[in-house]
Amino acid sequence: AKHFDGPKMFIAAAEESGNDLLDGRGDAYCGMLNASYNLKLRNINAYIPEYPVGDAEDCADMIHEFIPIAKAIEGLNNLKIISFGPRPLNFLACNAPIKQLYNIGVEIEENSELDLFEAFNKHAGDERIPALVKEMEEELGVGNKKPEILSKLAQYELTLKDWVEEHRGYRKYVAIAGKCWPAFQTQFGFVPCYVNSRLTAQGIPVSCEV
């Protein structure tokens, strides 16, 4: 376990019968206690089910139940959260405990809104904007109530996607912690909700004021 860099689980297979035990003694549960103590001594994080000893069928069930846990651990160990701007005053309770995120394997990149605004302005006139506007028009259909801002929304989406690719580093997954008020709308000229939902649908979760 010390040299395995993936998600780890410890369980013990109980003896199938007492016929072949030395003096009738089984070591599955005792071995599990010993293993858990040694994991703590070595600061190795491993998942141990509530009752980790069972027969073959029980152990198979425990392994099956570990699959979503392992996926979550693997995801966190390959996740980078890119943030823009501090939380607004009224959202102070939503301030993320960054130290604890690092403790569970998440990488954090903090940026200012000014960094984002600069990158957004540098994307003005990007040759990819017209094609993205057309895609948005087709997606919105009759819901396209403000066609005049689509070019800015496309510019913003390209800004975020380029930022993600340039800053993800070795991480497979990226999430964005953004900010949409109070100054965002007046300075950028739009609200980012539509772009946030589009990026989330593309596998880049975005949330504001978190």
Where is each model-derived feature located?
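An N-terminal assembly and electron-transfer interface module characteristic of large anaerobic redox
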Residues: A1-V210
